[in-house]
Structure formats: C-alpha cells, structure tokens
Amino acid sequence: MSDVKKVVLAYSGGLDTSVILQWLRETYDCEVVTFTADLGQGEELEPARKKAEAFGIKEIYIDDLREEFVRDFVFPMFRANAIYEGEYLLGTSIARPLIAKRQVEIARETGADAVSHGATGKGNDQVRFELGYYGLEPNIKVIAPWREWDLNSREKLLAYAEKHGISIEGKQSGGSPYSMDANLLHISYEGGVLEDTWTECEEAMWRWTRSPEAAPDEAQYIDIEFQGGDPVSIDGEKLSPAALLSRLNDLGAMHGVGRIDIVENRYVGMKSRGCYETPGGTILLRAHRAIESITLDRESAHLKDEVMPKYAELIYNGYWWSPEREAMQALIDATQRRVNGVVRLKLYKGNVIVVGRDSANDSLFDQTIATFEDDRGAYDQKDAEGFIRLNALRLRIAQRRG
C-alpha cells in the first residue's frame, strides 16, 4: 500500500489496538513495534506484552512513565491552574503529548518510518496524537486506521478478531458499557447512557471515588507543601511527584472528591458528554490557588487568570508542543518562583475546603496593614481619598457629558 517498512503502534492490548496490529501487517506488509505506556492507569501491563509476543512482535516497549508524566506534564499544567470550559481538569488531554513524544523517540531508536494510534476519527485524541508527532518529527508518516478501514463498528472488529484468531478475553460479556481512559490524574467515561444528556449515570459506573453520601462522616485535614509552585509533601512527608498525586487520589477518593459530569466542546466540532473522576487533581488545584493567594501579587495573579483559558484550550486541542504553549509556560513559570509555603485543607463529603495557608518567607499578606484593629499608622486611610478621586475622574466626566 505504501513504502512503510516499520510502524510504532501505541498498543494497549485491547480489542481495538490488537485488531490494528494485525491490520497494519496485513495492509502495509510492515513490521510493527508495540509501545505500551504506564501512566498509572492501574492496569496490569504484562498481558499487553504477552499479546504482542503472541503476534510474534520482536520489539516490545512497556515503559513506566508515571514520574515523567506527573513531573513534566501534570505539574506544569497545574502551575497554570488550567481548567477547560470551567470544569474539565484535562486528564486525558495532558497524557497524549507524552505518549506521542515516546512514540517518536522509539521510532528513532528502532529506525521506524511511521507511527500509529487507535484514536477514532470522531474524537480529539487523533488530533492530540498527530499534532504531537508532527511537532516533534515533521516528516514522520502517521497511520490512523480508523480513518482508513471499514471496520466501523464493534461487531466488525470482533468479526475481524475472530477471523484472524485474535484473542480478546471477555469480549462477549462482562465488560463496561463505557469508553474509559485512565491515568494517574483521572479516569474518564463516555458512551453508553451518557449519550443521553438527561440520563443520570448509575453509581456503579464510578470506579475510583466513593459517593459523597457514602464518604466518612468525619472530616480529614491535610497539609500540602509547595516549592516553586509544585507540591512536594503531604503532612510533612516528602514524596515523589507520582507518589504525591497517588496519595492525593487515595485521600480524595475516600472523601468523595473529584466527580464531574459535563458536556464539552470537542476540537473537531461536536459536543460530547463525559464523566470524570479527578480526586487528587481537584485537591491540588484548590491548594495551589490557595498558596498563590498569599504569595502572588495582584497583577501577576490576574494576568495568570487571563491567560489560563487560552493555555487550557491549547492543551485540550493538542498543542502542548507548540511555540505559543511554551511561551505561555515560560510566563507562568516565572510567576512561580516565590510560590512557596503550606496549605491546610479539610476534606469532607465531596468538598475540598481551604482552612489555612502560610508562607514563612514569601507571603505578601501583612496582618499589620490588613487588620481591622489599630494598625499603629501602617496604613493611612486618608490616602484612599485621592486614589478614589483619580479613579473616579473618567466616570464623572462621562456622566457630565450625559
């Protein structure tokens, strides 16, 4: 079909990517290298290796990318307080650039001339993967099977798998009715009853978190320490980035934190309903904004809030490797040098409540000035009169004009 000789496939070992593996060999008569990323999705990855071996694959990559994922992708994003359309914490979006990066690296290591993914032609992930590929390797060949083949239903995929002797455990029954994606930051659910925007999902859908109703009746307090805008410890215990996010996930899940049910605007033009569990990320966002509230000056904080929606949109749409995202990241990171201190939070039945924040060396909160008691001349209230009159000048002129 083309002169493609070797393809690096993002491989999960599931139905879709197993069919893709066989289809690539059949259609392109090429060698396939499989790549499976451990991003903390909580799945056993050895079955993916065994399935690849059963296909006779000679080069199999299973990489533990959890620390890199949190350190180099999740934490930089949270320095920006990024939220897409007011609710989505970008758990799927932020994982794609790392997968694309590693695929390109493996292509270079193995001499592959193409990469392939299992994203459908209707979703955002095809865009995110491929913008990543081209942003890192401009001349790479990309194969997107869902845009080429006629296997456009689950029934056709199963028939193809059966025809070619592809083993798909549990393919006939017992599986989830939802399309799910998980990593250390979140788990997402789409499809099934969620395609009706009025129908509430069943409680059994949620895999990570307790319902707020079933969460403990007693609140739990935790302290999160930040250095340079990144969290470094929980309750005084220093943790690696991945271990810290995992701990926050456990704490948030126990207290029913981090569930959302939203309809979002996909980059490809349609609206899509999704449910997400992001327990650790929800806690982290609240804590980060709290430490910024005492360490960032007003204009820096407001500037960050102005650029954040565009930054979040870039990540959602797949432009992590773009020059504009990198420029915005440099601006954001420059604001974080003095974002140091500790935030105390109360977790209770789905709520994350900030109850304290402290920074020994970088706080801009001056109690002697802000107090309602006698400030001993630290703030001259008479100064406010001229400030108000100057700022009111344009309003008075406009009113006189009528």
UniProtKB/Swiss-Prot annotation:
Compartments annotated for it: namely: Cytoplasm
Which residues does L-aspartate bind? 120, 124-125
Against InterPro entries, the record matches this protein to: Arginosuc_syn_C (IPR048268), Arginosuc_syn_N (IPR048267), Arginosuc_synth (IPR001518), Arginosuc_synth_CS (IPR018223), Arginosuc_synth_type_1_subfam (IPR023434), AS_cat/multimer_dom_body (IPR024074), Rossmann-like_a/b/a_fold (IPR014729)
SUPFAM superfamilies associated with the record: Adenine nucleotide alpha hydrolases-like, Argininosuccinate synthetase, C-terminal domain
Which reaction does this chain catalyze? L-citrulline + L-aspartate + ATP = 2-(N(omega)-L-arginino)succinate + AMP + diphosphate + H(+)
Task: Enumerate the GO terms in the molecular function aspect.
Answer: argininosuccinate synthase activity; ATP binding
**Keywords on record:** Amino-acid biosynthesis, Arginine biosynthesis, ATP-binding, Cytoplasm, Ligase, Nucleotide-binding
Residues that, per the record, bind ATP: 10-18, 37, 118
Q: Which family does it belong to?
A: Belongs to the argininosuccinate synthase family. Type 1 subfamily.
**Annotated binding of L-citrulline, by residue:** 88, 93, 124, 128, 179, 188, 264, 276
Its assembly, as annotated, is: Homotetramer.
Note the superkingdom of the native organism.
Bacteria
Main localization is cytoplasm
Protein known as: Argininosuccinate synthase
EC number, as in UniProt: 6.3.4.5
- Any single GO BP term: argininosuccinate metabolic process
